[in-house]
Amino acid sequence: MQYKHLLFDLDHTLLDFSRGEEVALTQFLTAMEVEDIQAFKDVYRPLNQGMWKDLEKGLITKKELIDTRFSRIFAHFGRQVDGREMALRYQEFIGRQGQIFTGADKLLQELTHRGYQIYAATNGVTYIQENRLLHSPIQSYFKEVFISEQMGTQKPVADFYEKIAEQISGFQFDQALMIGDSLTADIQGGNNAGMDTVWYNPTHMINNSKAVPTYTISSYQELLDLL
């Protein structure tokens, strides 16, 4: 199959979210005068990940996620805060984090050289994702960036991809490839939209989900070999 349009997930696929989050949380919590920063992080990460999973499943809204995650975590430590205000303050710190995985820039450079049309398809907050890309070395490789908050829908809902198709001239699902690390968002989303997928699985996780990737890779070089 000759693919023309490559849709890349960002976090954990090209952008090193874990590294960026570590820096941003430390800066944010220091500014908030949190004493035991590590204890806060240990509770925050699973809570935050769980809320994003709930969003994928349609159990909560993006607004609920953004407005309540910090009020919930601070409440866990006996401190009452305005969740929305904390979210806005945290955005300032996380938005500066454009760390990428080693080789991500060279991957996109080579794919661009080969003539592929490259797009970003990400679940996230518009301000955060746009600013993280601005602080990264890979922004220039994307013809367009599709962010769930702007789209009014998110992966894995088929409507997310249908809206992308409407905005790309000549887009055909059978000539497009969704590339990402998340089985429940990226691969299931591609399945729902009827397009081929690449599961980026550098840690060799077992697929216990219902999502069925067309291809599975563990390195960027494998993607280049595939294409």
Language model features: what each stretch is:
Residues 122:
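Conserved phosphate-coupling serine/threonine residues in phosphotransfer and NTP-handling enzymes
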